[in-house]
Curated annotation (Swiss-Prot):
Component of the TIM23 complex at least composed of Tim23, Tim17 (Tim17a1, Tim17a2 or Tim17b1) and a Tim50. The complex interacts with the Tim44 component of the PAM complex. Essential component of the TIM23 complex, a complex that mediates the translocation of transit peptide-containing proteins across the mitochondrial inner membrane. Belongs to the Tim17/Tim22/Tim23 family. The gene is Tim17b1. This is Probable mitochondrial import inner membrane translocase subunit Tim17 1. GO terms for biological process: protein import into mitochondrial matrix; protein insertion into mitochondrial inner membrane. It is a multi-pass membrane protein. Pfam families: Tim17. The chain crosses the membrane at residues 17-37, 61-81, 113-133. Its main location: mitochondrion.
């Protein structure tokens, strides 16, 4: 599907780890800047320095956590591609569930299972939305032959000459006795 433009698996792990670190550091930096700004003493200088101090203290840590998640997810995804010999949405769903479980393993079995469930559900939602979007956007990029384009144009002209709206032409006339 959309994975064909990506790097091969050993490099994909490093690429995903770096991308996840960048996302975590930037997103965590913005969040920590707001948090540090709000929690600093009053005065613009104190608030700006408080926001900057919070960014320096925590954004690297958040980026590191994201990098661990990205590397674990990508390593599991590459392993599944190798063993299953196919690259499909199930790999991402299984990788998300397994990553959630592995990263929560230190907190106990219940937390591990719930994190695995959340990771799998989250990746299933992401993959599902990606499939739906690609399905509906693929039709708009479908090539139309000149003959088919001419036929559609003639049908549209006939509809306009009859005075039938495009909605009625698509769904048919409404039977008023059924109302």
């Amino acid at each position: 599907m959309a994975e064909y433009g990506r790097e091969p698996c050993p490099f994909r792990i490093v690429e995903d780890c770096g991308g996840a670190f960048a996302m975590g550091a930037l997103g965590g930096g913005a969040f920590q800047a707001i948090k540090g700004f709000r929690n600093a003493p009053s005065g613009l200088g104190y608030r700006l320095s408080g926001g900057l101090a919070a960014v320096r203290a925590r954004s690297g840590l958040v980026g590191g956590n994201f990098a661990v998640w990205g590397a674990t997810f990508s390593a599991i995804d590459c392993s599944l591609v190798y063993f299953r010999k196919k690259e499909d949405p199930w790999n991402a769903i299984i990788s998300g569930a397994t990553t959630g479980g592995i990263l929560a393993a230190r907190t106990g079995l219940t937390s591990m299972l719930s994190s695995a469930l959340v990771g799998g559900a989250l990746l299933a939602l992401i993959e599902g939305v990606g499939i739906v979007v690609s399905h509906y956007s693929a039709d708009s990029y479908r090539q139309v032959s000149p003959v088919e384009r001419q036929q559609r144009y003639k049908q549209e002209l006939l509809r306009q000459q009859k005075g039938v709206s495009p909605l009625a032409a698509t769904y048919g006339e409404i039977d008023s006795s059924a109302l």
